[in-house]
Amino acid sequence: MKNDRDTLEFEANANKYSWVWKKATEKSRYRLFEKITSLFQEINLELQYTGIKFSINTEYSPEYLKEAASKYVEIWQLDETTFVAGKGHRKSVQQRHYEKLKEYLSKLNDYVEKIQICGDGRNSYSKTDHSATFMRIKKDYMGNDQLLPAYNVQVGVADEYIAVVDVNQYRSDMDCFIPLMNKFHDIYGFYPKYPVADAGYGSYNNYIFCEQNGLEKYMKFPMFKKETTDRNYHEYPF
């Protein structure tokens, strides 16, 4: 059975300036880890005469910070209702340290949540639509190369009929090929024999998938045209 596929990027109904970038969030989290380490070093210096010491690591979990904040309150018998604020009030060392612990805990929870929403398969999402991923769509009505929140919609056609449709969060068509083939298999109980697709789908992982599941490899790889028709490339490949 011959199965052709193409992709469409549908812009999501989300604010196009509401992006969250996974890599930027991870960098911010590691900078926060450094601040937490510095804070624990200060607290350990403060508590050295008590024999109590908080463990210092390269990474921290929200649970550990929450436990540390509770322990710190217990050690100093802190009462938040007595905390001072505003001009003319000098905060105690204990109040400053405790407030920093709470601040860092809040930030760390925020970073962890953002990274979990992104998941392993994508690097961004929209604050107003967590299912949408920022990608370049084929037709940008703004006439520019701006990244927009969208969904990658895959359509498989067999004998001029739409056989399967799949909606993904992946920016690359390469990553959408295997989920689409598996969805086809779930519906019909077999894989299409001839999965015809353009070079955007050709990758080592997809070829291996075809080999393992009895599909003919009808997708060109991204450099196919250059490697087969470009004379300069053959003479100077590097």
Where in this protein do the model-derived segments appear?
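Anion-binding and metal-coordination hotspots
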Residues: 1-238
